[in-house]
Amino acid sequence: YNAKATEIFHEGIRLPVLKLIEKGQLRDDLWRMLLLNSRCPDLLEGDLGAMIGSTRIGAQRLSDVIRNLGIEKGNAYLTAILDYGERSMRKAIAELKDGVYSASDFSDTDCFKLVDIETRVTLTIQGDDMTIDFTGTSPQIRGFKNSGIANTHSAVYCALSAFLDPSIPKNEGTYRPIKIIAPLGSVVNARAPAPMTMNTVFPAIDIMNACWGALAQCNPERACAGWGKSVFGISSGNKPEGGVFVLYHW
C-alpha cells in the first residue's frame, strides 16, 4: 500500500492480463518479475503456488466430469448449475417486501484531509428483481480508497451473501437478477488514473454496510450489524538472517 498515492501509477507495477502458466508450464520470466517486485517474495511465492495448485486441481476435476459425462451432457449440467443459482436468488428476492429503500455509510478521510465520503445505496425490490443504485455517492477522491467497478460488484455480492439464505449457490447465475448502477467518476466507480489499492477494504466495507442498511428495511429480522471496519494491526521488521517479515493481524 502507498497511503500517499494520488494516482494508480504510484501504486506499483501495472500488469495487463497475462498467462503465468502457458501450455501447462510456468513462465519463469514472469514468475521472477513478480517475486522481484515484492518485499516478501517467500510469502508471495507461497500464495501464488497455492492458487496455482488449487486451480490445477479444479481443472482436473472439471476434466473428469466432462470425460465421464461427455461434452453435451457436461455442458447441460454446468448450465443447470447456473440456472439453479438464478432460481434460488430470485426466490430469495421475491420473499422481500417490494419497495424502494435507501441507506448510506461514511468514511471520514480522503487520506489527506478529514472529509465525509458518502456511499449511498438506493435498493429497489420489484418482484424477483433487485436494483442497487449508487447514485448520490461521493465523487472519487484523491487518495487510494476508490473502487473499480469489479470490486464494487464483489462487495455488493458479499453483502447479499451475508444477508440472504447462506445456502444459495455463489455463481454467475446467482447474480443475474441483480442490477447494479454505479455512476462513473464516483468513489464506487472511479475514473482512471485514480488510485485504488485499498478498495477491497475501503470503500468495500462502506458498500456492504450501506447495502445492509437498505436490506434491513425490507426484512428487519435478517438485519446484519456493521462491524469495526479496518482495525487491523501490522507488525514488520528485519529478519536476523536477512529479509523482511510481515505479520498482518486480520
Q: Model segments located where?
A:
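Glycine/proline-enriched, intrinsically flexible loops and inter-domain linkers
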Residues: 1-129, 135-250
